[in-house]
């Protein structure tokens, strides 16, 4: 009997994010907000909305509402790209810095707690296996196209 690996991985991501989300409640950020801010921070500066949507794994139109909300909070700015007037570049504002630091701190601390009792070698092996799974899935998608 095969193990439900896909379901197990999806559940793991869901409960991990829920834990981080609970710990970030004092910042009054929704999960969508902190995931978006976290991704903007870790991508090279000035990414386009399309690139950000791909990094998060959502459709670009779904991202627009979240970006509107983050812009209203003064955490990001969007600028029209000089090379493609249809594209918008996203930048974090100075006021986002303390929030980003708090989010990163909670994520890092939670990661340490979640990985308690797991050796660095085991974490590396898990990361390698997950990367291989992703590569296989992407190859299957390309073969379907």
From Swiss-Prot:
InterPro entries per the UniProt record, alphabetical: HTH_MarR-typ (IPR000835), MarR/SlyA-like (IPR039422), Tscrpt_reg_MarR-type_CS (IPR023187), Tscrpt_reg_SlyA (IPR023071), WH-like_DNA-bd_sf (IPR036388), WH_DNA-bd_sf (IPR036390)
Traits of the deletion mutant: Pleiotropic, with decreased production of exoenzymes such as pectate lyase (Pel), cellulase and protease Prt. Has a 50% decrease in potato macerationafter 96 hours. Dramatically reduces transcription of carA, the antibiotic carbapenem biosynthetic gene.
Domain HTH marR-type: 2-135
Signal peptide bounds: none
Coiled-coil portions: none
DNA-binding region, residue intervals: 49-72
An individual GO BP term: antibiotic biosynthetic process
Top-rank taxon: Bacteria
SUPFAM superfamilies: Winged helix' DNA-binding domain
Record-level Gene Ontology MF annotations: DNA binding; DNA-binding transcription factor activity
Keyword set, alphabetical order: Activator, Antibiotic biosynthesis, DNA-binding, Repressor, Transcription, Transcription regulation, Virulence
HAMAP family: HTH_type_SlyA
PANTHER family associated with the record: TRANSCRIPTIONAL REGULATOR SLYA, TRANSCRIPTIONAL REGULATOR, MARR FAMILY
Job description of the protein: Transcription regulator that can specifically activate or repress expression of target genes. Regulates genes involved in production of antibiotic and exoenzyme virulence determinants in the phytopathogen. Required for the expression of the virulence protein evf during Drosophila melanogaster infection.
Similarity section: Belongs to the SlyA family.
Subunit note: Homodimer.
The protein, known as: Transcriptional regulator SlyA
């Amino acid at each position: 009997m095969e193990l439900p690996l896909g379901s197990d991985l999806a559940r793991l991501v869901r409960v991990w994010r829920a834990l981080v989300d609970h710990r970030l409640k004092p910042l009054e950020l929704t999960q969508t907000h902190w995931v978006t801010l976290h991704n903007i921070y870790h991508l090279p500066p000035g990414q386009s909305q399309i690139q950000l949507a791909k990094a998060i794994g959502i459709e670009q139109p779904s991202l627009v509402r979240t970006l509107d909300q983050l812009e209203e909070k003064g955490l990001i700015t969007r600028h029209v790209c000089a090379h493609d007037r249809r594209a918008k570049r996203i930048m974090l504002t100075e006021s986002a810095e303390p929030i980003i630091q708090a989010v990163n701190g909670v994520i890092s601390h939670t990661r340490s707690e979640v990985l308690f009792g797991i050796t660095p070698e085991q974490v590396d092996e898990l990361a390698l296996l997950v990367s291989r799974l992703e590569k296989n899935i992407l190859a299957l998608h390309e073969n379907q196209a």
